[in-house]
A protein has these predicted regions:
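Context-gated lysine
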Residues: 4, 35-38, 97, 118, ...
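Charged, low-complexity interaction segments
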Residues: 1-79, 256, 260, 264-305
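Short N-terminal helix-initiation segments at or just after the protein's N-terminus
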Residues: 130-132, 154-162, 195-202, 289-291, ...
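Cys/His-clustered metal-coordination modules, chiefly Zn-binding fingers
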Residues: 170-289
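N-terminal alpha-helical interaction blocks
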Residues: 18-176
C-alpha cells in the first residue's frame, strides 16, 4: 500500500514570492527535448524500461519536427480577446477540427516514427493509423479531446495524441502568457485540457510554487498547494507515496472528488519531467488502484490506468 503523508503547516503559502506567474506557455523544441531526455534516463531493459525508451523516440521525433514545420500563424487578436473576455481557453480543444495543416503534420510525424525502434504490435498500430481515412482520423481526434479512448485501440490513439501534442504545443507557444487567466477547475488556461501532473518548481523568484502541467499543449499554470488539481477543493487533501521512495513523487488525493493527481518536487530533483515521470512512476498508479481514489489526470501514454 502507498504510504500516507500527513499535511502540516501552511503549505499554501510556500514559495519565494507571494505572486508567482500564473502561466508559462511552452517552448516546443525545449519541451520535447527535455521530455525525450528524461524518457531516456528512465528507460532500461527491465519492467517498463523498453516502453519508456520507445516513448523517448516519439518525443525525439516531435522535437525534430518543431524545427522543420512551417511557422504557426500568429494569434488572432480578436479571437483571443473574445476568449479572454469570457474566461475561455484561446485554443479551445473542444472546438478543434483537423484541417489540412494538421493532416500534413500527422503524415510527417507518422513517417518519422517509422524509424523509431518499436515492438511488432506498436508497428502494426502505426501502420493502421497511417492508413486511416480522414473520417477515422477525425473520430480519433474527437475521442481524444473527450478523454475517451476505446481500450482495444489505445496504441493507435497514442500516435494521434503525439500529433495533437505537437500541434497544440506549437499553437500555445504563440499565446501571450501574461494575459492568460483561469478558465475553470482542472483546466489548462491555454487549451482547456486536463493536467497530466503538477510540479513544485525551483525557478528563481518562484521557488516552491506549484504548477499544473497540461497533458495536451504543455502549458504550465499556477495552482496553490494543498488544493485539488481537479476540483480545486481544499478539504480532505492528503498525500501518498511509495514506501521508502525518494520523497519526490507523491499522489495528491482529494476526498471531495475522489481523484488523485501526481505531484513532482523539482526542488529536490530538477530532472523530473511532468509528462515523462508520470509514465515512469506507473508503480504509484498501480498501488493507488488498491485505494478508493481514481486517477484524475490524463496521459495518452498511460491509457488504461
Amino acid at each position: 500500500m502507498p504510504r500516507k503523508v500527513p499535511v502540516s503547516g501552511d503549505m499554501t503559502a510556500i514559495g519565494e514570492v507571494r505572486t508567482a506567474p500564473f502561466a508559462r506557455v511552452p517552448d516546443p523544441e525545449r519541451l520535447f527535448e527535455r521530455r525525450a531526455r528524461r524518457f531516456h534516463q528512465l528507460s532500461g531493459p527491465d519492467g517498463i524500461g523498453p516502453y519508456l525508451g520507445f516513448l523517448a523516440g516519439i518525443a525525439e521525433a516531435q522535437q525534430a519536427l518543431t524545427g522543420q514545420l512551417p511557422e504557426t500563424d500568429a494569434t488572432d487578436e480578436a479571437r483571443l480577446g473574445l476568449a479572454l473576455d469570457h474566461a475561455m481557453p484561446p485554443l479551445d480543444r473542444n472546438a478543434f477540427k483537423p484541417d489540412a495543416e494538421f493532416r500534413s503534420l500527422t503524415d510527417r510525424l507518422f513517417g518519422a516514427l517509422q524509424e523509431v525502434a518499436k515492438p511488432p504490435a506498436a508497428q502494426n498500430a502505426l501502420s493502421a493509423v497511417r492508413k486511416a481515412d480522414d473520417a477515422s482520423l477525425d473520430a480519433m481526434v474527437a475521442d481524444l479531446m473527450a478523454d475517451s479512448v476505446p481500450v482495444g485501440a489505445m496504441a493507435e490513439f497514442a500516435y494521434v495524441a503525439a500529433a495533437l501534442q505537437l500541434h497544440f504545443a506549437r499553437a500555445a507557444s504563440r499565446l501571450p502568457e501574461r494575459r492568460l487567466q483561469p478558465v475553470g477547475d482542472g483546466a489548462c488556461p491555454a487549451c482547456g485540457g486536463p493536467p497530466v501532473s503538477s510540479l513544485i518548481v525551483g525557478w528563481p523568484h518562484a521557488s516552491g510554487s506549484r504548477f499544473c502541467s497540461c497533458a495536451l499543449c504543455g502549458t504550465l499554470w499556477h495552482h496553490v498547494r494543498i488544493k485539488c488539481a481537479i476540483c480545486s477543493s481544499t478539504k480532505g487533501i492528503r498525500y501518498q507515496e511509495i514506501e521508502d521512495g525518494p520523497g519526490t513523487i507523491k499522489a495528491e488525493t482529494c476526498d471531495e472528488c475522489g481523484c488523485y493527481v501526481k505531484i513532482f518536487n523539482q526542488q529536490k530533483d530538477s530532472s523530473l519531467d511532468p509528462f515523462a515521470d508520470d509514465v515512469g512512476s506507473l508503480g504509484l498508479d498501480l498501488l493507488m488502484r488498491e485505494t478508493s481514489f481514481r486517477r484524475g489526470a490524463f496521459n495518452p501514454f498511460l491509457l488504461g490506468y
